[in-house]
């Protein structure tokens, strides 16, 4: 037994112990993917091994399994008080797990979209399954054409790669075929009632006259459907006209749309409604599990009628609670309106909650991925805030961000009485990573200070000199750090007069801080994240002429 087989064997024994001696291959794979992150890249290799080893373990008696657990030091750890968090095990079969992320192309993705994308991707990774990206673009009014390219880019930033990609606008002929099949089964009918009449009948649990049309009559109307005007007719799926929820009673599957579609032009006029196209595609694409918000509970029930009419197996529907976004602007329509009016500079304006905006600020993709994974999939509502995001992101930035000086609204000062001549002051790029080396800050009695730091009293220019500030007069006091401490001197940053660069920092409220940074910043590349001491983390966004433009992340 090689090392990989031994790991699989231990997980199989543990799973068997939890399930009366019977291990499940999918659950074993899921356990490995969850607890052995280094092996996730070998999921396809692990699958066949797990199947073989689980079969071996299941042939053992429970006593034999216990003996093997003792031999391999496998223990069942019980912790009933453990708080439920993270992604719990998927219900149902874990064989051939197929899941999907299915956004509307109304704009780029924001944190709310990650709520759906991340769990689907993570579950597929855990169980060695397949992830489908399906662009649900069957409502021309909700299509923002650039989103066709923006959505895959955002998923790539999150580290999510779909195994297959589909566009619902490419699948109209498929929807037409299944609509006709429903009519032929007597499970759908063409309804020519006006909306108000149908609503009154539906609200009173009464069928409309069209419900009793013959199959032949419905097919005749179906064949003429694309010649009708919007609102003249719809195709309805038969459900229960007495259902307690009026929205589920004979819901609309197809309607006329007269708007021009960005991808289709005016090729089609008969458009599927979401519940119809989604159910057809989920069946044809082999979805094993469907994750959706609890606001889709009624839609899941609607779609089950279609599954029943067609004799299809129903996937595992899993619903999760709302994700409340405290102080995070997420509305795509409001963002687009703000961009059009000039309120926002674009989809990556730092005030927005789009993935592009937070990436521009130096928020790491793993921060968002881990945050959503930690929230998990549960019916109770959850809340996130910038404070929570910043706390997680700080863990990623602390070890990678080198430290630099920046002074806002710089004031050049001369230290009277300084006689030590020119010196090069060395400060580490990162105190915890000496291997990265030092920055050199030349000092010869002159420096730039932030205007807010030029205040009367004793101050220490960090690692340089102690000075006495009295109005416009700045006098040398000493060099000793111990003396600065005894004098309770204020420690302030400074930037060399001899070696500096113009810096602007776009803040999270879109305001801009301008000033000077030390010369070592010139070695940075766009995309690098730094920590400006006493200011916070920031990502280099642009290098232009003699100016570096950063976007502020957080403290």
Swiss-Prot record:
GO molecular function terms noted in the UniProt entry: ATP binding; glutamate-tRNA ligase activity
Enzyme kind, highest EC tier: ligase
Motif ('HIGH' region): 103-113
Alphabetical list of Gene3D superfamilies matching this protein: 2.40.240.100, HUPs, Ribosomal Protein L25, Chain P
EC number: 6.1.1.17
Broad class of where this protein is predominantly found: cytoplasm
Coiled-coil intervals: none
InterPro entries xrefs: aa-tRNA-synth_I_CS, Gln/Glu-tRNA_Ligase, Glu-tRNA-synth_arc/euk, Glu/Gln-tRNA-synth, Glu/Gln-tRNA-synth_Ib_cat-dom, Glu/Gln-tRNA-synth_Ib_codon-bd, Rbsml_bL25/Gln-tRNA_synth_N, Ribosomal_bL25/Gln-tRNA_synth
Cell compartment(s), UniProt: Cytoplasm
Keyword flag Lyase: no
Catalytic activity: tRNA(Glu) + L-glutamate + ATP = L-glutamyl-tRNA(Glu) + AMP + diphosphate
The family this protein is said to belong to: Belongs to the class-I aminoacyl-tRNA synthetase family. Glutamate--tRNA ligase type 2 subfamily.
HAMAP family: Glu_tRNA_synth_type2
Described function: Catalyzes the attachment of glutamate to tRNA(Glu) in a two-step reaction: glutamate is first activated by ATP to form Glu-AMP and then transferred to the acceptor end of tRNA(Glu).
Protein name: Glutamate--tRNA ligase
Lineage: Archaea, Methanobacteriati, Methanobacteriota, Methanomada group, Methanobacteria
């Amino acid at each position: 037994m090689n090392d990989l087989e031994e790991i699989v064997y231990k997980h199989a024994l543990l799973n068997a112990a939890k399930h009366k001696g019977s291990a499940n291959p999918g659950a074993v794979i899921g356990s490995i993917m969850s607890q052995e992150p280094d092996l996730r890249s070998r999921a396809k290799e692990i699958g066949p091994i797990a199947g073989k080893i689980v079969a071996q373990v299941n042939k053992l008696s429970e006593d034999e399994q216990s003996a093997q657990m003792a031999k391999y030091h496998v223990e069942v750890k019980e912790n009933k008080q453990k708080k439920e968090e993270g992604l719990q095990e998927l219900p149902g079969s874990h064989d051939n797990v197929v899941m999907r992320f299915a956004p509307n192309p109304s704009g780029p993705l924001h944190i709310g979209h990650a709520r759906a994308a991340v769990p689907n991707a993570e579950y597929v990774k855990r169980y060695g399954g397949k992830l489908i990206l399906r662009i649900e673009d069957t409502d021309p009014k909700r299509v923002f054409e650039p989103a066709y390219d923006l959505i895959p880019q955002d998923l790539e930033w999150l580290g999510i790669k779909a195994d297959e990609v589909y566009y619902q606008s490419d699948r109209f002929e498929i929807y037409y075929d299944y609509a006709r099949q429903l009519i032929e089964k007597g499970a759908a009918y063409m309804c020519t009632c006006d909306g108000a009449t149908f609503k009154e009948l539906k609200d009173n649990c009464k069928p409309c006259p069209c419900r009793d049309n013959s199959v032949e009559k419905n097919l005749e109307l179906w064949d003429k459907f694309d010649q009708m005007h919007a609102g003249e007719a719809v195709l309805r799926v038969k459900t229960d006209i007495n259902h307690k929820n009026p929205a589920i009673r004979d819901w609309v599957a197809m309607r006329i749309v007269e708007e021009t579609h960005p991808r289709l032009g005016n090729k089609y006029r008969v458009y599927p409604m979401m519940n119809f196209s989604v159910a057809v595609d989920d069946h044809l694409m082999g979805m094993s599990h469907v994750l959706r918000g609890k606001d889709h509970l009624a839609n899941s029930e609607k779609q089950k009628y279609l599954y029943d009419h067609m004799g299809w197996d129903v996937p595992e529907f899993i619903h999760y609670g709302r994700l409340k976004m405290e102080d995070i602007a997420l509305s795509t329509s409001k963002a687009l309106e703000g961009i059009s009016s000039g309120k926002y500079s674009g989809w990556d304006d730092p005030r927005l909650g789009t993935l592009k905006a937070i990436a521009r600020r130096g928020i790491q993709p793993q921060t968002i991925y881990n945050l959503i994974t930690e929230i998990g999939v549960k019916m109770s509502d959850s809340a996130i805030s910038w404070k929570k995001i910043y706390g997680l992101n700080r863990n990623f930035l602390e070890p990678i961000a080198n430290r630099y000086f920046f002074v806002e609204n710089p004031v050049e000062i001369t230290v009277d009485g300084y006689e030590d001549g020119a010196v090069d002051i060395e400060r580490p790029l990162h105190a915890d990573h000496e291997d990265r080396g030092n920055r050199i800050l030349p000092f010869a009695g002159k420096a730039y200070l932030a205007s807010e730091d030029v205040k009367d009293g004793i101050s220490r220019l960090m690692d340089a000199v102690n000075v006495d500030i009295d109005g416009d007069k700045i006098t040398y006091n000493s060099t000793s750090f111990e003396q600065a401490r005894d004098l309770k001197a204020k420690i302030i940053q400074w930037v060399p007069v001899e070696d500096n660069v113009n810096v602007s920092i776009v803040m999270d409220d879109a305001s801009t801080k301008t000033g000077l940074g030390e010369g070592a910043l010139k070695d940075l590349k766009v995309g690098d994240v730094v920590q400006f001491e006493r200011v916070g983390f920031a990502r280099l966004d642009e290098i232009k002429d003699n100016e570096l433009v950063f976007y502020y992340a957080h403290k």
